[in-house]
């Protein structure tokens, strides 16, 4: 059963960034400060990277997403308001009519999220 819920959601900045990393952004929903986790996307870690290459690509992914948002004409959230283990709302982020997750994957700054296996950025980046 799908329930439609109306909510006031807006992106917010924290330390001059809209997004913490390439797949987590800051929002305000009905006046509460929360984070969203972009669905179907995995980007390199920046808080606890396993190698320098992972950190570098993670920062590029974050900066790319922040630039997309800063230059957007329209921003939409598509979510069922489900939360992940860390309390982030799982959501699609649509920027100017395009799925942000898809754009990040197309630009080789992330991969499609796989629940069964964590992507090994250091192993993959070693071969580039």
Enumerate the language-model features and the residues they cover.
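Small beta-barrel nucleic-acid-binding modules, primarily SNase/OB-fold domains
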Residues: 1-128
């Amino acid at each position: 059963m799908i329930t439609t819920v109306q909510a006031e959601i807006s992106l917010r900045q924290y330390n001059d960034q809209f997004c913490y990393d390439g797949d987590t952004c800051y929002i305000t929903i009905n006046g509460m400060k929360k984070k969203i986790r972009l669905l179907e996307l995995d980007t390199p870690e920046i808080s606890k990277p396993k190698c320098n290459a992972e950190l570098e690509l993670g920062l590029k992914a974050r900066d790319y997403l922040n630039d997309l948002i800063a230059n957007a004409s329209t921003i939409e959230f598509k979510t069922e308001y489900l939360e992940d283990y860390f309390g982030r709302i799982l959501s699609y982020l649509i920027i100017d009519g395009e799925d942000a997750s898809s754009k990040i994957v197309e630009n080789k700054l992330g991969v499609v999220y796989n629940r069964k296996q964590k992507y090994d950025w250091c192993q993959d980046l070693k071969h580039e």
